[in-house]
């Protein structure tokens, strides 16, 4: 058995021929980087006619859901130019970077390189004392695939991880976090201000990143060229 060998902060492409056309989607493994013999992907299935915005559903996710146990798939990687090498150190486009604090903004239903980085920091504690501040946004709390793991496994292990959830739709039961959209006010309240020892890790819809997140971070003192890494 072998290790996948995927550096922390990078992802793989799953490739398949669907309807006679090549389809590729990027996924971040949820299993530890040193896992031997297998790796895990957490994928939400977007079924046809489930969401009026996407009447055909997810092409790749439905294809994967249709595969029988024991089927094979093609993957390629690693992909992305950002890697977390541990204990506050990043490699970005081949250059070493250092961060005492991470300001993480994550929106969407999938798992991301942000999750991978968080797990790597937690695995190295107490040697890795990186502070992590996460704003995690989604339509509903049920769409936050890793929320249960964050609440039950990650948060109890460290005081260096601070999390603020934001949902578009208020849950039926009690909800003690944010409702609405991620904006500059939310970012200022739950993320550290920019300085030479803070890096922002951003993953989400392009429109949100360009229209809200990047302008907000710039007003908070972040150097967008050096301290804002978009996955």
From Swiss-Prot:
Binding site for FAD: 25-28, 42-47, 59-61, 112
GO MF terms, alphabetically ordered: FAD binding; metal ion binding; nitrate reductase (NADH) activity; nitrate reductase (NADPH) activity
Gene3D superfamilies in alphabetical order: Nucleotide-binding domain of ferredoxin-NADP reductase (FNR) module, Translation factors
InterPro entries according to UniProt: CBR-like, Cbr1-like_FAD-bd_dom, FAD-bd_FR_type, Flavoprot_Pyr_Nucl_cyt_Rdtase, FNR_nucleotide-bd, OxRdtase_FAD/NAD-bd, Riboflavin_synthase-like_b-brl
FAD-binding FR-type domain sequence ranges: 1-85
CDD domains for this protein: cyt_b5_reduct_like
Pfam families linked to this entry: FAD_binding_6, NAD_binding_1
Reactions catalysed: nitrite + NAD(+) + H2O = nitrate + NADH + H(+); nitrite + NADP(+) + H2O = nitrate + NADPH + H(+)
Keywords, ordered alphabetically: FAD, Flavoprotein, Heme, Iron, Metal-binding, Molybdenum, NAD, NADP, Nitrate assimilation, Oxidoreductase
Listed cofactors: FAD; heme; Mo-molybdopterin
Domain of life: Eukaryota
GO biological process: nitrate assimilation; nitric oxide biosynthetic process
EC numbers, comma separated: 1.7.1.2
Ranges that cross the membrane: none
Top EC class of this enzyme: oxidoreductase
SUPFAM superfamilies: Ferredoxin reductase-like, C-terminal NADP-linked domain, Riboflavin synthase domain-like
Cofactor note: Binds 1 FAD.
PROSITE patterns for the chain: FAD_FR (PS51384)
Similarity remark: Belongs to the nitrate reductase family.
PANTHER family: NADH-CYTOCHROME B5 REDUCTASE (PTHR19370), NITRATE REDUCTASE (PTHR19370:SF100)
Subunit description: Homodimer.
Protein's job: Nitrate reductase is a key enzyme involved in the first step of nitrate assimilation in plants, fungi and bacteria.
Protein name per the record: Nitrate reductase [NAD(P)H]
Organism: Zea mays
Lineage, highest ranks first: Eukaryota, Viridiplantae, Streptophyta, Embryophyta, Tracheophyta
Gene giving rise to this polypeptide: NAR
């Amino acid at each position: 058995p072998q290790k996948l060998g995927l550096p922390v902060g990078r992802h793989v492409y799953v490739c398949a021929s669907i309807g006679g056309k090549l389809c590729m989607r990027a996924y971040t493994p949820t299993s530890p980087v040193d896992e031997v013999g297998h790796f895990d992907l957490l994928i939400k299935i977007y079924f046809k006619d489930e969401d009026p915005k996407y009447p055909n559903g997810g092409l790749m996710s439905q294809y994967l859901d249709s595969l029988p146990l024991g089927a094979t798939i093609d993957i390629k990687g690693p992909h992305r130019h950002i890697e977390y090498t541990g204990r506050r150190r990043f490699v970005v486009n081949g250059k070493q970077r250092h961060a005492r604090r991470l300001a993480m903004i994550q929106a969407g239903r999938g798992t991301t390189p942000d999750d991978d980085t968080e797990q790597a920091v937690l695995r190295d504690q107490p040697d890795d004392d990186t502070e992590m501040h996460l704003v995690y946004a989604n339509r509903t709390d049920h769409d936050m695939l890793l929320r249960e793991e964050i609440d039950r496994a990650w948060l109890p292990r460290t005081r260096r991880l601070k999390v603020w959830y934001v949902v578009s739709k208020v849950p039926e039961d009690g909800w003690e976090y944010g409702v609405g959209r991620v904006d500059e006010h939310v970012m200022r309240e739950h993320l550290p201000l920019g300085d030479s020892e803070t890096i922002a890790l951003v993953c989400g819809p392009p429109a949100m990143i360009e229209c809200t997140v990047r302008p907000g971070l710039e007003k908070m003192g972040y150097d967008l060229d050096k301290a804002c890494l978009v996955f």
